């Protein structure tokens, strides 16, 4: 009987863990994609850029600049967080989102990401972002960047609005 219990623990333990991970991944996917899915206009320093985010079954794909910028967002089971990896121009980056609070992204919610940006020369830049949700159709993003041993740089504020 003892061997049967040990075998059952080895068989059903991983299955239960996979169910918890799948549930957490689905929750994060629903939380982020339900808000960010769609076409957005990002405005920074008077320049507007269209970014389109398309929710897929288990991830979110964002693109802009005629396909020159691409990001894939999805559940990272190692970090147990919503994470994004992207490439645009000659740079590559990754972001990891903080744990979400509440059932939905709505006005007044703040979201934060931490990440890294890599330049072609190998320079690595640490970054953090703060998203402030204004309403169902607009948000602002403040970004800070810092290279090793240098002062933190505050990037100009980005305002995003959903294309109706």
Pin down the residues of each PLM region:
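Residue-level recognition of beta-strand termini and adjacent short loop/turns
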Residues: 121, 135-137
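Sec-dependent N-terminal signal peptides
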Residues: 4-11
């Amino acid at each position: 009987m003892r061997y049967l219990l040990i075998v059952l623990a080895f068989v059903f333990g991983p299955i239960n863990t996979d169910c918890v991970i799948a549930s957490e991944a689905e929750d994060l996917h629903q939380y982020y994609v339900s808000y960010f899915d769609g076409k957005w206009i990002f405005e920074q320093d008077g320049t507007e850029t269209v970014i389109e985010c398309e929710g897929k079954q288990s991830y979110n794909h964002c693109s802009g600049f005629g396909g020159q910028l691409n990001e894939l967002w999805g559940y990272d089971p190692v970090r147990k967080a919503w994470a994004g990896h992207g490439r645009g121009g000659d740079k590559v980056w990754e972001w990891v989102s903080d744990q979400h609070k509440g059932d939905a992204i709505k006005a007044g919610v703040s979201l934060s990401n931490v990440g890294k940006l890599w330049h072609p020369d190998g320079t690595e830049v640490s970054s953090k972002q703060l998203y402030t949700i204004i309403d169902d159709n607009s948000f602002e993003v403040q970004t800070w960047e810092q290279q090793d041993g240098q002062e933190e740089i505050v990037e100009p504020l980005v305002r995003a609005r959903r294309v109706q």
